[in-house]
Amino acid sequence: MSLTIIKGTILSAPTLGQLDALPGGYLVAEDGLIRGVYGSLPEQYAGAPVEDWGDALILQSFADLHLHAPQYPMLGMGMDLPLLDWLNAYAFPTEARFADTGYAREIYSRLARELIANGTTRVCMFSSLHTDATLILMEELEKAGVTGYVGKVNMDRNAAPGLLEETTEESRRETLRWLDACQDFRLVKPMLTPRFTPSCTDELMAFLGKLAAERDLPVQSH
């Protein structure tokens, strides 16, 4: 059993609108699961190593429920444009670069480290349509200790050059290849991700719906 004991000012929000602070409190975790928060260390943990953070605040991490990983290099750009113009001018060209796995590794390793550095440990994340880049993203998140869901985007119509799977069959094939390749991840799991209605044919949506039901997979979209 692995045991972690952290001492500091423990913040918790047991109910909506309630914030509790426990100065000099102890947070005890066994095998990665929090077992309790205590004003004094329980006797069964006496003598165990304690990470003492003094008066530092110990609080829950953040969860980002909608994050487009391949848009990380263009944060804050083009905010003067309406959505579709912004997609065509900034988002789609940036996402197309993730066909390059070397570029994907560079960007996604930085993104994973920055998430952890800023206290975000759980995500629901869009990748691009590139299977290999999506697997790299999952690898980097897992390496950094981020937990959550990642989706290989599906797009088989109405997309910019370089961001369109040539056929619906290719989209199906790459989705299955991705799912087969990511079965061994421990912290990061797959989530089916049709980008949005304009970019997915009815045939593709029917396939993804059937796949979600057969494999009990979650789905995210817009």
Indicate residue ranges for each PLM-predicted region.
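Metal-coordinating catalytic core of metallo-dependent amide/deamination hydrolases
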Residues: 132-221
